[in-house]
């Protein structure tokens, strides 16, 4: 076990300075433990003091507002020349000890927090029984007092009624109760109270605060200091409401703008000024005389040579009066008939072309060689005109063409019958066809021209040539 001794001790400094710091051997004289200022104004701190043995001492010193000082309430000793410290011995520490087991607050430098609470456990039954007995005694005493008071009050009421019957007075006048008879407490002035009790806001009951507030939007009416100088308070006008409404609601007639003469931009010459209302009538007659002189000059203009006459429009034809004699219009009817004929002929020509195309499509395609025919020359205008005029000639030509085609087909059938291939030639052709299938595309392409020359169709071509 260690031989160190531990004691809790309270260091104090009287009120007056701002800051007090405790230092000593416990912190190597570094001044790290400030004292706490209490409500009374003095400085205190409770901390544990360690002593190595019974003969050891605890040396310390105070730093008051930055000045190292020694307290007269503690013992002093001279360590060296000019240096003096306070100290504590074991006897000083034992005298100031309190009840053991009190809890300390380490953050507050070991300040006492109070006695430790009692250990948890069931409450004692003896205390409960004692409390119940005491409560019963109190209740019984209160009941006795209440019964005595009721009896006294009933006796006093009976006595008062007897006295009233003898004197003939009523019991309307009743003495005041205890609350009514107690005097009111005199109001105490706030200024005479203790210095610690004060109000946050001062109360000034002066005449200025009782007056109305002149600020706009504040409480009370606005009082102007110079009402006589303001015109709105003195001037009064009498206005008739009907007259004012009629005058305001009256619609003012707006004059319409006069449309002036429109002058075209193409006119370059200045036109003569129009006569005004104030001018004499003679000037207008002169203007009319000048206009009449200009009209015959316009009529005297001769027409140009070889000028085409304008055709009459349908509007002009309508505007001709009925009294004038109208010749029969034969030329217009003829032109209409010609147009109808041309349209019908065009339709017939289109139908003929369609028939010719269908006939060409219906031609029989055979395996016979094609004979070179001379190209057909385009028809001239005369031939087309003749074909249109004489449909019988075109029918004869078509019959001739059909006969020629039939004769050609008969000749082809006869030649094919005469030159039918024999059985050997057929076998050769089958062998050649099989060789064609097995041959490569390159060899087949090279042998094609030779086959054309030696084939059956080649011989037929030579005959027709």
Swiss-Prot record:
Residues 160-161 are annotated as: X-DNA-binding. One of its GO terms (biological process) is signal transduction. It holds the Pfam family AMPK1_CBM. The modification Phosphoserine is found at residues 153, 156, 271, 319, 343, 394, 440. GO terms for cellular component: cytoplasm; nucleotide-activated protein kinase complex; nucleus. The modification Phosphothreonine is found at residues 182, 295, 366. Cleaved in the vicinity of position 160 to give an X-DNA-binding N-terminal subpeptide and a non-DNA-binding C-terminal subpeptide. Transmembrane segments: none annotated. Cruciform DNA-binding protein which exerts an enhancing effect on the cleavage of cruciform DNA (X-DNA) by endonuclease VII from bacteriophage T4. Belongs to the CRP1/MDG1 family. This is Cruciform DNA-recognizing protein 1. The gene is CRP1.
